[in-house]
């Protein structure tokens, strides 16, 4: 099912942050959402994901079960190791196949096997971000929502990230909120400018 937004308006008290937005997303590919800080980009992702229902208008094709979200704040479980954070987020059963998928994804995002047993308080911001991204990539959802996915990454890790997004976006929709289009220009994203 395509993700379609019709006449979406979102207010915080008397302040309108999204005003009558209508947009039909493609079934696959990369869409970059840009705009000034505080304009409603992350709020739009929260609405698409089904985490925010306090709006007027219509959103079809989003919601829990249809999207996978890599938050800007990482949202890792503090009592789980890096590998277990990924496994727990994608599956409630820990078996060899799931462990292999999680390890392969973490390695493809530039983490080392020695990082797998580290807990969030032992990880750098970039490592936390890549674990959050691994969780989103491995969830079986037709739409991925990535909020500032390159924020904590160096050029080498941005390159690894864009390689994965390039592959995933062949049959899934990847929506990226970013302030830095330069980091993802190699993906040739469709640009949705919010003002």
Question: Residues of each region from the PLM?
Answer:
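Q-loop/switch helix immediately C-terminal to the Walker
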Residues: 80-92
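Conserved structural motif at the start of ABC-family nucleotide-binding domains
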Residues: 3-5, 18-20
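Conserved ABC ATPase signature
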Residues: 119-123, 127
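Conserved ABC ATPase "signature" region
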Residues: 97-114
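Helix-to-loop junction immediately C-terminal to a conserved catalytic motif
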Residues: 49
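The feature captures the beta-strand-to-loop junction immediately N-terminal to the Walker
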Residues: 34-36
């Amino acid at each position: 099912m395509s993700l379609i937004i019709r006449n979406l308006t979102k207010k915080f008290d008397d302040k309108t942050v999204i005003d009558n937005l209508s947009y039909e997303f493609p079934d696959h590919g990369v869409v970059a959402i840009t705009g000034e800080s505080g304009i409603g980009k992350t709020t739009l992702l929260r609405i698409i994901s089904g985490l925010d229902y306090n709006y007027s208008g219509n959103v079809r094709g989003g919601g829990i079960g249809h999207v996978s979200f890599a938050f800007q704040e990482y949202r890792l479980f503090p009592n789980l190791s890096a590998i277990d954070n990924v496994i727990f987020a994608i599956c409630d059963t820990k078996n060899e196949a799931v462990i292999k998928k999680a390890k392969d994804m973490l390695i493809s995002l530039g983490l080392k096997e020695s990082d797998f047993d580290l807990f969030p308080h032992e990880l750098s911001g970039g490592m936390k971000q890549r674990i959050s991204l691994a969780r989103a990539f491995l969830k079986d959802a037709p739409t991925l929502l990535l909020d500032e996915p390159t924020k904590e990454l160096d050029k080498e890790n941005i390159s690894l990230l864009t390689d994965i997004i390039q592959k995933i976006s062949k049959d899934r929709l990847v929506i990226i909120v970013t302030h830095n289009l330069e980091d993802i220009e190699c993906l040739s994203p469709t640009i949705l400018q919010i003002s």
